[in-house]
């Protein structure tokens, strides 16, 4: 019985470690230089998550994984990606409002897919929606 409990706890711990999430927000230090009588103003951080892209291989190779499912209901847009076996590694790219800074993470082998829920009632320009939640597992 003790071995079964230990095995179950280990399996749960490994499952918990096998999730990858984009941070909800980031802080970016910007520095602008202007000539003349101009004054630089900055918007208040944090910058919220507005986009999720999955790549088959490094993002620089631009092999985007197409969503498997896109559903719209009750003010939400639900997007799912399946991650089949690939010779290249999958990468997750997280985009944020009001910045060109993005975060990228190599997804561990064995990930089956990613899911994101966007809030259709909150947009940030350039047709980007607020991400309510997302996870790859």
Model-derived regions, located:
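Mitochondrial intermembrane space
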Residues: 18-137
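N-terminal signal peptide c-region/cleavage motif recognized by signal peptidases
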Residues: 13-17
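Positively charged n-region of N-terminal signal peptides that target proteins for export
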Residues: 1-4
């Amino acid at each position: 019985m003790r071995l079964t409990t230990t095995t179950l706890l280990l399996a749960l711990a490994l499952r918990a470690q096998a999730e990858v999430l984009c941070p909800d927000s980031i802080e970016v230090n910007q520095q602008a230089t202007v000539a003349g009588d101009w004054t630089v103003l900055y918007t208040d951080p944090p910058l919220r998550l507005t986009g999720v892209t999955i790549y088959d291989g490094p993002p620089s190779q631009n092999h985007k994984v197409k969503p498997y499912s896109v559903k719209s209901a009750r003010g939400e847009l639900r997007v799912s990606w399946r991650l089949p076996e690939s010779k290249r590694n999958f990468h997750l790219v997280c985009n944020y409002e009001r910045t060109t800074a993005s975060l990228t993470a190599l997804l561990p082998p064995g990930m089956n897919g990613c899911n994101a829920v966007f809030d259709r009632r909150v947009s940030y320009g350039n047709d980007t929606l607020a991400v309510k939640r997302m996870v790859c597992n």
